[in-house]
């Protein structure tokens, strides 16, 4: 399956995941603003960097949207919708406002594609450690509130 990653800050986690499964995924490119970081990532992974949405090939199977969602002042949701209109399945990284999720789910159904919000955070070592710690505390006492 051909995969494109949109965004290169947190998107690098997705790039590494794609790289680990070359038998399942073909890293088809990066869609980003053209910063030095995005150029460096494209060069490092040996994939094209697209800065214009219309230049992205039409044979992409999955788009990983790792750009701020509309609720956070970014264009992630807008980009997700554009991909789904093209018939591309979308994984959009959190946080995504529930209204944006509803819009994306409707678009996915209309365009007969899949839409999923990412859950990469729960797999990060620090978050796993926090979850394990909270579970251990819960064995000994009830937790009323976490800050």
Predicted regions and their residues:
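N-terminal Rossmann-like dinucleotide-binding module
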Residues: 1-45
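Short catalytic-loop micro-motif centered on adjacent basic/acidic residues
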Residues: 5, 90-93, 115-118
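Short, surface-exposed connector motifs at secondary-structure boundaries
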Residues: 21-24, 85-90, 111-114
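Conserved acidic residues
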Residues: 28, 61, 143
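A short helix-to-beta-strand connector/capping loop
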Residues: 42-48, 110-115
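Beta-loop-alpha module in the N-terminal Rossmann-like domain of NAD(P)-dependent dehydrogenases
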Residues: 48-107
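A contiguous active-site-proximal alpha/beta segment in oxidoreductase catalytic domains
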Residues: 97-146
């Amino acid at each position: 399956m051909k995969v494109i990653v949109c965004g290169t800050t947190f998107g690098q986690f997705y790039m590494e995941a794609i790289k680990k499964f070359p038998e399942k995924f073909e890293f088809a490119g990066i869609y980003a603003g053209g910063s030095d970081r995005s150029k460096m990532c494209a060069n490092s992974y040996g994939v094209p960097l697209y800065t214009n949405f219309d230049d992205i090939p039409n044979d992409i199977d999955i788009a990983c949207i790792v750009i701020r969602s509309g609720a956070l002042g970014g264009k992630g949701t807008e980009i997700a919708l554009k991909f789904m209109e093209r018939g591309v399945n979308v994984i959009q990284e959190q946080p995504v406002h529930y209204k944006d999720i509803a819009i994306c789910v409707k678009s996915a159904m209309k365009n007969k594609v899949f839409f999923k919000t990412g859950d990469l955070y729960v797999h990060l070592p620090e978050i796993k450690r926090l979850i394990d710690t909270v579970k251990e505390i819960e064995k000994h006492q009830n937790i009323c509130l976490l800050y």
